[in-house]
Structure formats: C-alpha cells, structure tokens
Amino acid sequence: MEKKIVKDILFLSQVSQPANQDDLYLARDLQDTLLANRETCVGLAANMIGVQKRVIIFNLGLVPVVMFNPVLLSSDGPYETEEGCLSLVGVRPTKRYETIRVSYRDSKWQEQTITLTGFPAQICQHELDHLEGRII
C-alpha cells in the first residue's frame, strides 16, 4: 500500500531497529510507495514511510531491490556529490563511494551479498544513511 512520505526531521534522525520476519509486509509498502513516486524517487528507507525498521528499497536498473537489515561490508573509491531526498527540500553535498559490498536478507528472508557500483551504489548508501538516522 502506498504510504505518505515522512518529513519530520526528528523522526528521521532516529536509528532504525532491526527488522524481523513480521516486517516482510514492508517490502510491498515500500515498493508501492516507490512506484507512486517514480518521477522523483529512486530509493526509500522504511523510516521515510513512518516505520523505524532496517528495511530499504532502491532501483537496480528496472528491478526494485528490497533489503532487510542491510550491512555495509566494504566501500571503495570515495567521491563528493550532491543528493536530494523526498523527505527534504533541495540538494545537499555528501561523500559517497563508487563501489560497495552489502549483506542483507531478501524478501524470502534468505541471506544475500551484493556488490554495487556507480549510481545504484550511491542510492543504496543514501538509504543506508537513513537507517542510521543520518540525513544528508
């Protein structure tokens, strides 16, 4: 179900709690909300739809990837960029990495590891920051 985007900075500044299998419904809510905002959005974290759980979604090409309890394992190739966010107005400078490796659980609660480069890596890092309460 599509959800309203949270813009409350105090709420977004809180560290998200680990997800469990009871939170699998968030995959559909995040997917529906991402699709509804596809003109201006390429990724979301669960706190952006009002749920303080460690769940993110982002587009990897045409395929939305949902990650439960993602953990950044490694990063390489730092660079400076500017990003926007549905929860904020405007763009802000930030540091990102060209290549990252992330472990997570998928929608079937299976452990996965993925290496991302370029724009998908940037999106994933942005959403991982949301889980830590870091706002660009």
PLM features: what roles do these ranges have?
Residues M1-I136:
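Positively charged
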